[in-house]
Amino acid sequence: MKIYSDLSNADYHSMSDHVSSSFVKAVAKHSIQRAMKKFDPTPALIFGDAMHTYFEDRLAFVRRFVVFDDTEIVAKILEQRPEISVPSMTREYKTFKAEFEQSVKDDQTVITQYEMQSIEYMYKSAVDNTGLQSIYQDFDHDDIWDEYSFLTNEPDFHGLNYRVRPDRLLVKDEQPVVIIDWKSCRDASERAFRADFWKFRYDLQAAFYCNLLEVPMDQFFYVAIEKEFPYNSAVFSLNEDTQMKAMRELELIKERIGKWKENPSPETSGLANANTITYL
């Protein structure tokens, strides 16, 4: 297993020969064909990336993200012309925005002041969460690894190599003990997170990470944090039944991907139920 402490996002995601958790989840939800499809970053993905980076590496956040703060220019416009109903449509505002955009470097991503404030509130909510605090207290660790990248050296019996990049690891003697995964959401209640859990196949994510890092699945914790007021946070893990089912399904998906790697074809890359009759 190769371990990288400072591998960039771009370099990590370029290693497409190694199967990732995202790939596994996409196969489970649809097919290998869908898992291979490239998607442009959405505003939600950009916000999630900014949030994770802020939580884990402030220096990287400052390098990669720049905040568009129009508070002062809006206040100035309204002070001079209080009759203006939409300051962003004025010449002064457009000039200010154009000058700002010219100052942004090619490798930087712009987020709004509102998004920046939301991330700060989310961070405080997570830090203050006593459930999360208890994890740090209950599990003996001597280090914390944020966004370390792990890549296997040799293919397994399915002929596959794997990669994982956990948000946060609690580590003891260089060995991962606990996996913590930040989840931005609109609703951190049990009902809402349970729906997200199955919709986005977080169970398979935990199985994949824990299997590769040899961490017990009941030591994988999701910290769900609302990205809107009141910015509640809650901590979740997996019960024994969910753990076992996720591990079994993970092995079936690995087998499916392995067969496709060995024999790429529409039959091996398409829907699992494409060439049979399915009774509902």
What feature does the model see in each segment?
Residues 150-203:
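Non-catalytic protein-protein interaction segments used by genome-maintenance enzymes to assemble
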Residues 97, 195-203, 208-280:
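Metal-dependent nuclease catalytic regions and adjoining charged, substrate-binding loops involved
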Residues 39-40, 107-108, 191-200, 239:
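Short histidine-centered catalytic/ligand-binding loop motif
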Residues 1-164, 276-277:
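Metal-dependent nuclease catalytic cores that hydrolyze phosphodiester bonds in DNA/RNA
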Residues 28, 55-60, 184-187, 214, ...:
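Hydrophobic/aromatic-lined pockets within catalytic cores
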